[in-house]
C-alpha cells in the first residue's frame, strides 16, 4: 500500500489590518459575511452554513448573527478594529449581522446598501402558490 506523504503546507501568515470592509450578502436562503482589507483581499468569512445551520434554519436572523460573530472574531485575530459594512440582498439576516459585528467589538464606521436593482432586467420567478 502506498504511503501518504505529508506535504509541508505553508501556514497562512497573519496580516495585520486595522481597517476593513464587511460584505454581508443576505439572500432568502442564507447569509454570507466576508471581511476584506480595503484592497478587497479576503481576511475572514463565514456563512450560516459554515457555523452549523442546515436547511431552512440558515435563513434566520439568528444564523446570520452567528455567522457575523464568527467572521468578526477571525478578523479581529488579524488586528482589525473598524469596518465599513456593505449590505447586499433582501434576506432576513441583514440587520442581525450588522448588530452582531458591533457586539463582537468591531467599530462600524459606515453602513451602505449595495443591493443590485435592475432597470427592468430579467423576468422574476413566478409567484409561489402554497
Curated annotation (Swiss-Prot):
Superkingdom of the source species: Bacteria
Transmembrane segments: none
Classification via Gene3D superfamilies: Ribosomal protein S11 (3.30.420.80)
CC annotations in GO: ribonucleoprotein complex; ribosome
Keyword Nucleotide-binding: no
Ribosomal protein recorded as keyword: yes
A Pfam match: Ribosomal_S11
Keywords: Ribonucleoprotein, Ribosomal protein, RNA-binding, rRNA-binding
Recorded GO MF terms: rRNA binding; structural constituent of ribosome
InterPro entries given in the database record: Ribosomal_uS11, Ribosomal_uS11_bac-type, Ribosomal_uS11_CS, Ribosomal_uS11_sf
GO biological processes: translation
Quaternary structure, from the entry: Part of the 30S ribosomal subunit. Interacts with proteins S7 and S18. Binds to IF-3.
Alphabetized PANTHER family for the sequence: 40S RIBOSOMAL PROTEIN S14/30S RIBOSOMAL PROTEIN S11
Family: Belongs to the universal ribosomal protein uS11 family.
Its biological purpose: Located on the platform of the 30S subunit, it bridges several disparate RNA helices of the 16S rRNA. Forms part of the Shine-Dalgarno cleft in the 70S ribosome.
NCBIfam families: PRK05309.1 (NF003698), uS11_bact (TIGR03632)
UniProt protein name: Small ribosomal subunit protein uS11
Gene source species: Caldanaerobacter subterraneus subsp. tengcongensis (strain DSM 15242 / JCM 11007 / NBRC 100824 / MB4)
Amino acid at each position: 500500500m502506498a504511503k501518504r506523504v505529508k506535504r509541508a503546507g505553508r501556514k497562512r501568515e497573519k496580516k495585520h489590518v486595522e481597517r476593513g470592509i464587511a460584505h454581508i450578502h443576505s439572500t432568502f436562503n442564507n447569509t454570507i459575511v466576508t471581511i476584506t482589507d480595503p484592497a478587497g483581499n479576503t481576511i475572514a468569512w463565514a456563512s450560516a452554513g459554515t457555523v452549523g445551520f442546515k436547511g431552512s434554519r440558515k435563513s434566520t436572523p439568528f444564523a446570520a448573527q452567528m455567522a457575523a460573530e464568527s467572521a468578526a472574531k477571525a478578523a479581529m485575530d488579524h488586528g482589525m478594529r473598524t469596518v465599513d459594512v456593505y449590505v447586499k440582498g433582501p434576506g432576513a439576516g441583514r440587520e442581525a449581522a450588522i448588530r452582531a459585528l458591533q457586539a463582537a467589538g468591531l467599530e462600524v464606521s459606515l453602513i451602505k446598501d449595495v443591493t443590485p436593482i435592475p432597470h427592468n432586467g430579467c423576468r422574476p420567478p413566478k409567484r409561489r402558490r402554497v
